[in-house]
């Protein structure tokens, strides 16, 4: 939808905007936009908001360099709030935190301990560390070495998985597979591919008689 007449701005001419990392799915921040800010966002794909305290439009990262390239914009069912899905550069929060929502009021008492949930959490942590590059972080060190370094690690870990499987060493196979998955998730994050993108490919290969092979068609 590009017809802004369907948006319900409040009496001050503003609409709340929730901003989400398009890669990890993490909620980064919540702000407001006026009509001009929304129009500028749609025209430039630069996340643009309206500051209620300063009474002016502002572009995320214009001063800090922590920019947000807008991948897509969505409107909720009532037309009175927006979702910006962005590619975040650096931390989103002015405190230096990856997300403005870093202070829990209620902790998750039953986190998803299955493979899906674990991979999503690890991927989210990787994208957060890539955004902030904290000193001493393994992710930061890998990133500093360039993509070739992590690709070499993937090759090494794949070899370890093969060896552990050949030796039928279950504990070692689980450990080496975890290492392989971690470094693969890192490579995905570096090039902007999410676990959801991979899941979509796998789901597309599901046939009535089971998973289709990578080369199978139809």
From Swiss-Prot:
EC number annotated for this UniProt entry: 3.5.4.19, 3.6.1.31
Transmembrane segments: none
A GO cellular-component term linked to this record: cytoplasm
Localization (cell): Cytoplasm
Any one GO BP annotation for this protein: L-histidine biosynthetic process
Involved pathway(s): Amino-acid biosynthesis; L-histidine biosynthesis; L-histidine from 5-phospho-alpha-D-ribose 1-diphosphate: step 2/9; Amino-acid biosynthesis; L-histidine biosynthesis; L-histidine from 5-phospho-alpha-D-ribose 1-diphosphate: step 3/9
Annotated region described as Phosphoribosyl-ATP pyrophosphohydrolase, given as residue ranges: 119-218
Stored InterPro entries: His_synth_HisIE, HisE, PRA-CH, PRib-ATP_PPHydrolase-like, PRib_AMP_CycHydrolase_dom, PRib_AMP_CycHydrolase_sf
Molecular function via GO: ATP binding; phosphoribosyl-AMP cyclohydrolase activity; phosphoribosyl-ATP diphosphatase activity
Catalytic activity, reaction form: 1-(5-phospho-beta-D-ribosyl)-ATP + H2O = 1-(5-phospho-beta-D-ribosyl)-5'-AMP + diphosphate + H(+); 1-(5-phospho-beta-D-ribosyl)-5'-AMP + H2O = 1-(5-phospho-beta-D-ribosyl)-5-[(5-phospho-beta-D-ribosylamino)methylideneamino]imidazole-4-carboxamide
Keyword vocabulary terms for this entry: Amino-acid biosynthesis, ATP-binding, Cytoplasm, Histidine biosynthesis, Hydrolase, Multifunctional enzyme, Nucleotide-binding
Positions of the UniProt region annotated as Phosphoribosyl-AMP cyclohydrolase: 1-118
Enzymatic class: hydrolase
Major localization listed first in the record, in broad terms: cytoplasm
Keyword set includes DNA repair: no
HAMAP family noted in UniProt: HisE, HisI, HisIE
Entry's family note: In the N-terminal section; belongs to the PRA-CH family. In the C-terminal section; belongs to the PRA-PH family.
Protein name from the UniProt record: Histidine biosynthesis bifunctional protein HisIE
Organism name: Deinococcus radiodurans (strain ATCC 13939 / DSM 20539 / JCM 16871 / CCUG 27074 / LMG 4051 / NBRC 15346 / NCIMB 9279 / VKM B-1422 / R1)
């Amino acid at each position: 939808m590009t017809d802004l007449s369907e948006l319900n701005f409040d009496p001050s001419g503003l609409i709340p905007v929730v901003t989400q990392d398009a890669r990890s799915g993490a909620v980064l921040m919540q702000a407001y936009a006026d009509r001009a800010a929304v129009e500028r966002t749609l025209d430039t794909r630069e996340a643009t908001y309206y500051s209620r305290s300063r009474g002016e439009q502002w572009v995320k990262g214009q001063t800090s360099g922590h920019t947000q390239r807008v991948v897509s914009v969505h409107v909720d069912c009532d037309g009175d709030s927006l979702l910006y899905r962005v590619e975040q550069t650096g931390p989103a929060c002015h405190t230096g935190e990856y997300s403005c929502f870093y202070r829990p009021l209620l902790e998750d008492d039953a986190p998803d301990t299955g493979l899906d949930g674990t991979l999503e959490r690890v991927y989210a942590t990787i994208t957060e560390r890539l955004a902030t590059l904290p000193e001493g972080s393994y992710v930061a060190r890998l990133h500093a070495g360039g993509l070739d370094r992590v690709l070499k690690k993937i090759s090494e870990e794949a070899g370890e998985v093969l060896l552990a499987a050949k030796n039928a060493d279950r504990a070692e196979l689980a450990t080496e597979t975890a290492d392989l998955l971690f470094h693969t998730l890192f490579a995905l994050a570096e090039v902007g591919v999410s676990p959801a993108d991979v899941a979509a490919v796998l789901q597309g290969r599901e046939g009535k008689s089971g998973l289709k092979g990578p080369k199978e068609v139809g």
